[in-house]
């Protein structure tokens, strides 16, 4: 597979979250994505607000200034210093998103003294698979599905081994 470098902003719509004071957030159902590397970046669940600073995205990759990166197929609001990334002209699915999340994690691991500004992210390049000079999202999807299938076989294999081991212990 051939790979080529692409400027992040040539491939993704990059938007940022904004600070909402904690006292303005009320417990609710919409996940709030922060810079944490725990729980898929979710810091809590809150009611939607009608404020220009309240930014909501759906079906996107979150990328924080600390380099945390997750896929969110659901509607979520973004905290300050969290970016949303959506491919231009392509709708993410779980497989392509997982491929891209891992690429972003590898590409930005330890870069910029572990802090990545909006400016740095937008000027950055990411190496993506291409076919006929076009980004190959189909390859990304098949690649992750192949890994998933191999993992299922391994899980089945280990389950069979565990059953056989228990049977031997009973004898």
Give the ranges of each region predicted by the language model.
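Non-catalytic DNA-recognition/assembly elements of restriction-modification systems
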Residues: 1-19, 24-40, 131-171
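DNA target-recognition domains and sequence-specific DNA-contacting regions of bacterial/archaeal
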Residues: 10-125
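IQ-motif-like calmodulin-binding regions
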Residues: 128
């Amino acid at each position: 597979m051939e790979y080529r470098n692409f400027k992040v902003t040539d491939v993704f719509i990059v938007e940022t979250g904004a600070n909402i004071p904690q006292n303005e957030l009320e417990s609710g159902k919409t996940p709030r994505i922060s810079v944490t590397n725990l729980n898929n970046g979710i810091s809590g669940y809150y009611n939607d607000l009608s404020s220009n600073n309240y930014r909501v995205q759906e079906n996107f990759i979150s990328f924080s200034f600390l380099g945390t990166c997750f896929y969110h197929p659901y509607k979520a609001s973004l905290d300050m210093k969290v970016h949303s990334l959506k491919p231009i002209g392509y709708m993410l699915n779980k497989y392509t998103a997982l491929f891209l999340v891992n690429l972003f994690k590898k590409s930005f691991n330890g870069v910029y003294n572990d802090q990545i500004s909006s400016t740095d992210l937008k000027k950055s390049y990411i190496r993506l698979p291409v076919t006929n000079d076009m980004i190959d999202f189909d390859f990304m999807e098949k690649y992750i599905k192949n890994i998933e299938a191999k993992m299922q076989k391994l899980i089945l294999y280990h389950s069979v081994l565990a059953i056989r081991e228990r049977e031997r212990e009973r004898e």
